[in-house]
Amino acid sequence: MLKRSLLFLTVLLLLFSFSSITNEVSASSSFDKGKYKKGDDASYFEPTGPYLMVNVTGVDGKGNELLSPHYVEFPIKPGTTLTKEKIEYYVEWALDATAYKEFRVVELDPSAKIEVTYYDKNKKKEETKSFPITEKGFVVPDLSEHIKNPGFNLITKVVIEKK
């Protein structure tokens, strides 16, 4: 009887220990790791491939600061066109991350542009390319031969108003 009880308890403990391992594995595999690269912090994942980093300051028509949201990174693909309308859409998402549905974009600063800095392997020096924000837009260049995760940066003031 004692042997049977010990065997039963051993089997029961093994079942519980394997079920906790199985649950952790299934939970960790549900996150699509192919789209993100793990950074230094375990809770931080940055996009793999090119991304648009939106770092804006929301001002009213007189230039008074209304909102200064944290920067937000959006994955983009080489060959796609970034128009003024699309960029305003990304800016509104960045505003919503801080104040959800409270503000709308009126206009971007006329001098606003998107910049990317990378080490050009052919010229053997650091390059910075600037792209103006226009209605027609610009095509995102493929910089994969120079850099794995090129960050296209939009850092500007944006005129916003309450919705």
From Swiss-Prot:
SUPFAM superfamilies hit by this protein: Staphylokinase/streptokinase
Record GO biological process: symbiont-mediated activation of host plasminogen; symbiont-mediated suppression of host complement activation by activation of host proteases
Keyword set, alphabetical order: Pharmaceutical, Plasminogen activation, Secreted, Signal
Signal peptide extent: 1-27
Compartment list: Secreted
Short name of one Pfam family: Staphylokinase
InterPro entries linked to this entry: SAK, SAK/SK_sf
GO CC annotations, alphabetized: extracellular region
Family: Belongs to the staphylokinase family.
Function noted in UniProt: Potent plasminogen activator that converts plasminogen into plasmin. It forms a 1:1 complex with plasmin, which in turn activates other plasminogen molecules.
Protein name: Staphylokinase
Gene (name only): sak
